[in-house]
Regions:
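N-terminal cofactor/phosphate-binding cores enriched in small/glycine residues
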Residues: 1-6
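His/Asp/Glu-rich, glycine-adjacent segments
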Residues: 8, 13-196, 202-208
């Protein structure tokens, strides 16, 4: 929120990813909004708790709503906050199903992403996915001398948490790239002289994930 609005939490209203709601006495996510349904998700999501405009919103104003604004991220808060209040779509990976999901706040879910979900989403490929070190195991000098067996991590062994594990692995960035390429190929973004915005968020590890 700070990056896309240029403001501090005291102004943009996003004080954390989650906080305690004194009205409901329950934790609340920064992009929760029960007024909007989800696409390919049961989460109710919107940027309505964001109190200031983003540079995506300002681009929409400057182009009289002619600019296209899309956001793709591993997590819903990153996707929605970067798309802003007036974006055309924000998409993130469903950690339970492996499908790319969105929110009805931004209007109709795009046909090309529905097609992607039915043909290429990670749930079709999770069994074959595995994470390996980039270099030969012997090049990692900080490992014990006896560590000569190559390390491989398969997400399928997690069963109930396989997509959560995928989202917090380096391979999620490959998935972000795949769906971004599909968006660039099949949507109208970048196909005229009007400046558009594609906000892409990658995972690099953080305290909460």
């Amino acid at each position: 929120a700070a990056l896309y609005t240029g403001t501090t939490p005291s102004m943009n209203g996003i004080i954390a990813e989650r906080w305690f709601d004194p009205k409901t006495l329950r934790p609340k996510n920064c992009v929760d909004d029960s007024a909007f349904m989800g696409n390919y998700t049961d989460q109710n999501t919107a940027p309505t708790q964001l109190l200031t405009s983003t540079f995506a919103d300002e681009l929409k104003i400057a182009t009289k709503n002619a600019a296209l604004v899309y956001a793709i991220a591993p997590f819903r808060d990153a996707a929605v906050l970067s798309a802003g209040h007036s974006g055309n779509g924000a998409f993130w990976l469903n950690h339970a199903t492996g499908k790319w999901c969105g929110t009805t706040y931004y209007g109709e879910y795009p046909w090309w992403l529905s097609q992607y979900n039915e043909q290429q989403s990670p749930d079709f490929r999770i069994k074959e996915m595995e994470w390996n070190p980039l270099h030969p195991i012997t090049s990692y000098t900080f490992l014990p001398e006896w560590r000569t067996i190559p390390f491989k991590y398969k997400f399928e062994i997690e069963k109930d948490n396989k997509f959560r594990r995928l989202i917090t692995s380096p391979l999620i960035n490959d998935e972000v790239n795949r769906v971004t390429e599909d968006l660039l190929d099949k949507s109208n973004i970048g196909k005229d002289e009007i400046t558009d915005l594609l906000a892409v968020t990658y995972y690099a590890g953080n305290y909460n994930h």
